Amino acid sequence: MTGRDDISEAKSKGKILAPSVGNEKSGRLHGPAMRSKGFAITDLLGLEAELQPPSISLPNCEGPGVSLGGVSLTNGSLPLGLGFLCGFASQQPPGTTCLLPTHIPFLQPRPDHHYLHTSDKHKENISDDDSILGDKNDLKASSAQSKRKKRRHRTVFTAHQLDELEKSFNEAHYPDVYAREMLALKTELPEDRIQVWFQNRRAKWRKREKCWGRSSVMAEYGLYGAMVRHSIPLPESIINSAKNGLVGSCAPWLLGMHKKSVDITSKVDADDLVTERSRGESQVRDFTNPHSESHRSPRHHSHSMDISEERAIDLSSTAKQENQSSGRHNSIRDSQSDFTDSDH
């Protein structure tokens, strides 16, 4: 049996065959393509293999029968990692068998496009994950920016505004709504800005008092704030302690602030009384002297004109009546004088 017959028989059976020395000589006679030098594990270990591999030619080599180290492949190029086996086969002695990956199931070569396909999928998955993470980060950043409170523009006070605010703060640390509105008209500031300024000024004052160590003043300050907020009157004990003076009282600062507030209210009441008296006097003047227009207010001008007209009408009617009565008296006197003359 020749080497070609062995190759055809091995291809039909699908088994690995190891050629003998005689077959090697006949293969040399037929050409370099029939040279069979194998390096099977069984031959390397010195064992006789029942199944012998055939030699497979490579189509990419020079000529149809050219082999690498005595072994050629027909199914294409060598798979990755088996190049050193071909180099090792050239150093093996003749008669050794060849272990080929095409006939062993666990050494089957995988196509390159499979690796490329899996790598592309992996890259796509990674890019998708990165895009999802990037979108999440963008959403978190946008939500954080929306939740972040925008800082209001800081109000810059002028010297005139600060002077007015300090004056009102020295008068009362807790101004009511009416006082804040009046101060807003003077300083041309919003009422809420004035309220915030007073809050900050009170905090600054408390901090300064704490640094000085005046704890009693801080206690009085807290009591005064509670009194103003809840409309609580000043206790009688504190008022009675101020009979000998503010210095000997138990709460001098609180009594001083109370005195200021009382003075302000009394001043307002006095102003109201003065205005009421002036109004009463002007009305009396209008009734007594209807022709005088110097003391008339523009608010009651029309009313005073009506009153003066009515009084003028009344005066004219009374004058007529007086004239009539005087004429009657004169006529009676004349008649009496005539009667006396006739008697004589």
From Swiss-Prot:
Where's the CVC domain?
210-263
Stretches with biased composition (Basic and acidic residues): 1-12, 111-126, 273-284, 303-313, 331-344
User: Which parts of this chain are annotated as the region Disordered?
Assistant: 1-33, 111-154, 273-344
Instruction: Tell me what organism the protein belongs to.
Output: Xenopus laevis (African clawed frog)
In its UniProt record, a GO molecular function of this protein is: sequence-specific double-stranded DNA binding
Which GO terms of type biological process are on file? regulation of transcription by RNA polymerase II; retinal bipolar neuron differentiation
Q: Where in the body, by tissue, does this protein show up?
A: Initially transcribed but not translated in early neural (stage 15) retinal progenitors. Translation occurs during late retinogenesis and requires cell cycle progression with the timing of translation paralleling that of the generation of bipolar cells. Also expressed in the ciliary marginal zone (CMZ) with translation beginning in early postmitotic cells. Also transcribed in early neurulae in the presumptive spinal cord, with expression expanding anteriorly to the midbrain-hindbrain boundary during the tail bud stage.
Q: What does this protein do?
A: Involved in the differentiation of bipolar cells, the last neurons of the retina to form. Together with other retinal homeobox proteins, acts as an effector of a cellular clock which, depending on cell cycle progression, establishes the generation of distinct retinal neuronal cell types.
Q: Which UniProt keywords apply?
A: Developmental protein, Differentiation, DNA-binding, Homeobox, Nucleus, Transcription, Transcription regulation
The similarity comment for this entry is: Belongs to the paired homeobox family.
Localisation: Nucleus
Q: Which gene encodes it?
A: vsx1
- Any Pfam family from its record, for instance, is Homeodomain
Keyword Transcription listed? The answer is yes
Q: Where is this region: Octapeptide motif?
A: 39-46
Protein name, UniProt field: Visual system homeobox 1
**Keyword flag DNA-binding:** yes
Composition bias type Polar residues, residue spans: 315-330
Q: Where is this motif: Nuclear localization signal?
A: 146-150
GO (cellular component) term, any one = nucleus
Enumerate the CDD domains for this protein: homeodomain
The entry's DNA-binding region feature spans: 150-209
